[in-house]
Regions:
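Active-site activation/catalytic loop segments of kinase-like enzymes and analogous catalytic loops
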Residues: 6-50, 65-83
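Short, hydrophobic secondary-structure boundary micro-motifs
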Residues: 22-25, 55-56, 89
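Regulatory N- and C-terminal appendages and interdomain linkers associated
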Residues: 71-113
């Protein structure tokens, strides 16, 4: 599909800003000790490699991607409810709807919503 490359790139970056309890996030982790670049370094590396400016408003992009992920998890929750979920992780994913939506709303408010 065609879309804004920054939407895809920011989807990668949400791992840096959400806690480990939510979708295996890195928020709060000692990135340096883990050998993982900071979010700022990652943005700089992407921008340099792609020959573009980095994202202008990450908070909006984080809100978009987290709401999107919450909606996907809501669909999984429906399949769990209906007994049609195939994944062994479906219940875990379904339980993340509200925390993901809350995180998304937090970023939306930071971005000016």
């Amino acid at each position: 599909t065609l879309g804004d490359p920054m939407a895809d790139f920011s989807y990668l970056l949400i791992g840096w800003v959400i806690p480990a309890t939510l979708r295996n996030g890195l928020g709060g982790a000692d990135l340096e000790a883990l050998g993982i670049p900071s979010i700022e370094e990652t943005v700089e590396r992407y921008a340099a490699a792609a020959g573009v400016a980095g994202p202008k408003n990450l908070d909006w992009l984080f809100a978009y991607n987290l709401f999107r992920l919450a909606a996907i998890c809501q669909g999984i929750a429906g399949r769990v409810r209906d007994g049609t979920a195939a994944s062994s992780h479906a219940r875990t994913m379904a339980a993340q709807v509200q925390p993901l939506a809350d995180a998304a709303w937090g970023f939306a408010k930071k971005a000016g919503a």
